[in-house]
Amino acid sequence: MLPFLIALQFLSSLPVSLPGMPAAREVGRSLLYYPLVGLLFGLLLWLASHLLQGTPAPLHAALLLTAWVLLSGALHLDGLADSADAWLGGFGDRERTLQIMKDPRSGPIAVVTLVLVLLLKFCALWVLVEQGVGAQLLLAPLIGRTAMLGLFLCTPYVRPGGLGQALAEHLPRRAAGWVLLCCALFCLLLGGWVVLLAVAVFAWLRHLMYRRLGGATGDTAGALLELLELAVVLGLALGL
């Protein structure tokens, strides 16, 4: 139960109280529960969409997106903004890229990236609302957080210290493989071709991280999640 609470506290803005400072082993095990947190997000969004039935589609989509951002506390959007600034401002240099990621200030590239991602997600949700969204709302949050588990399983963590290193070093790898397999089968049954799109986007983004940094950071993991969620809702809206 503790690893799930750790995952929920880290990935969401929901009020979660831990009994104390968790051990590194429990922090590593919390990664196994990231997909479950994603599923919980999806269920809450599905419920919100049901309660908003009858609302004009643009407002329905805007409120859904607002709930989505509030649930995560904009944590991963922050990672996306930092990664966007660093990727373009780093000019291909590893150390410069990592240094820019640590800068708390957001440049114009970060702002433009966030606006485009949120605009595209809003438009995709608008289309899905008009089509009658249902169980498909489970997919994007679930795939996004499952991808974080997959990233830490198969990609070195390049920034020493902190939560990310504890996650990477203490992740139970065999159990993680089984969790990924079960999630993949569930998502394939629910989403079909859009899951293959998500896998392709994951592989491409991981390749970019590995080529530039030699691995992943917390910021790039957050960027991965946001871009995968966007890819999934766009794929669903386009009828893939």
From Swiss-Prot:
Cofactor: Mg(2+)
One of the protein's GO biological processes: cobalamin biosynthetic process
Location of this chain's protein in the cell: Cell inner membrane
Example of a GO MF term: adenosylcobinamide-GDP ribazoletransferase activity
TM regions (residue ranges): 31-51, 57-77, 109-129, 133-153, 185-205
Enzyme class: transferase
Source organism superkingdom: Bacteria
Involved pathway(s): Cofactor biosynthesis; adenosylcobalamin biosynthesis; adenosylcobalamin from cob(II)yrinate a,c-diamide: step 7/7
Zinc found in the keyword field: no
Predominant place of localization: membrane
Enzyme Commission (EC) number: 2.7.8.26
Membrane topology, from the record: Multi-pass membrane protein
Function, in words: Joins adenosylcobinamide-GDP and alpha-ribazole to generate adenosylcobalamin (Ado-cobalamin). Also synthesizes adenosylcobalamin 5'-phosphate from adenosylcobinamide-GDP and alpha-ribazole 5'-phosphate.
Family (UniProt): Belongs to the CobS family.
Record's protein name: Adenosylcobinamide-GDP ribazoletransferase
Naturally occurring in which organism (per UniProt): Pseudomonas putida (strain GB-1)
High-level lineage: Bacteria, Pseudomonadati, Pseudomonadota, Gammaproteobacteria, Pseudomonadales
Name of the coding gene: cobS
